[in-house]
Amino acid sequence: MSSMNLRRLLPQRAKQERPQPESSKKKGFLERKKDYVERAKDYNNKRDTLKKLKLQAAFKNPDEFNYKMISSKLVDGVHSEISKTSLKKEQIIDIKTQDILYLQSKRRADDKKIERLQATLQYMDSGLEPTEQIIYVDDEKEVKNFSATKYFDTVPDAFNGSLSTIPKISKLKEGSLVVNPKTAPTLGQLEAMTATSYKELKERKLRRDQLFKAEMDLSKSKIQLKRGTKSGVTKKVGKKEVVFKQVRSK
């Protein structure tokens, strides 16, 4: 076996780069090849970027509109964004007033829907659990002469068992119709309708409360904006938070 082959079989010592001599440290950092490669890549990337930018600037139309023209400005030669909240105090108050009116309209619409749902649920509940009404009379003669249609001001068809409520003749004249037993919903359908309606009622009440809270917060911020001062300042005193409020002296 030759000496060259034997040298390959022996463990080789890891190559180490020459350290920087103490005498040349004052001249600066001793650049290795890996440092040169990184520096060359960075230089080439910057050169290519500048070349592309110069090409774009050469072909750019000076009259071309760009939204940056109205959303930024030059401050000491540096482009800076224009603040979008530079509104006058009166404009902010008007915006908050419009928001409050919008929330009020939505809350009133929810109130009407809640009232309709509650009325519908009362009708369904009365259909699921019919109740009896007891009428007291003085003697047997009144019992014999008692007329339910006259007493309740209704029609005889109102007592056939298919109605959950007894309609008045005045309501019937307005156009209300007696429920047809053939088209009346079954007990299972009524239970399903009731469960769905109760769920919707709960969601609408929650939404109404959230709208009311948002409306109150907007009203409070609007009042504070008009006054120009905060109603209370919260500061930490030790481990507790204390709210300081300005009290008007008599």
UniProtKB/Swiss-Prot annotation:
| Gene Ontology annotations of biological process type | rRNA processing
| Keyword annotations | Nucleus, rRNA processing
Q: Which Pfam families match?
A: Utp11
| Localization, UniProt | Nucleus, Nucleolus
Report if keyword Transmembrane is assigned. Answer: no
InterPro entries the record matches: SSU_processome_Utp11 (IPR007144)
Region Disordered: list its residue ranges.
1-31
Q: Name one GO cellular component term.
A: nucleolus
The disulfide bridges present are none
Q: Which residue stretches does the UniProt record annotate as biased composition, category Basic and acidic residues?
A: 14-31
User: What does the function comment of this entry state?
Assistant: Involved in nucleolar processing of pre-18S ribosomal RNA.
Hey, which family's this protein in? Belongs to the UTP11 family.
Q: How is the subunit organization of this protein annotated in UniProt?
A: Component of the ribosomal small subunit (SSU) processome.
Q: What PANTHER family does the entry give? A: U3 SMALL NUCLEOLAR RNA-ASSOCIATED PROTEIN 11, U3 SMALL NUCLEOLAR RNA-ASSOCIATED PROTEIN 11-RELATED
Its protein name is Probable U3 small nucleolar RNA-associated protein 11
Species, as recorded? Dictyostelium discoideum
Tell me the gene name.
Answer: utp11
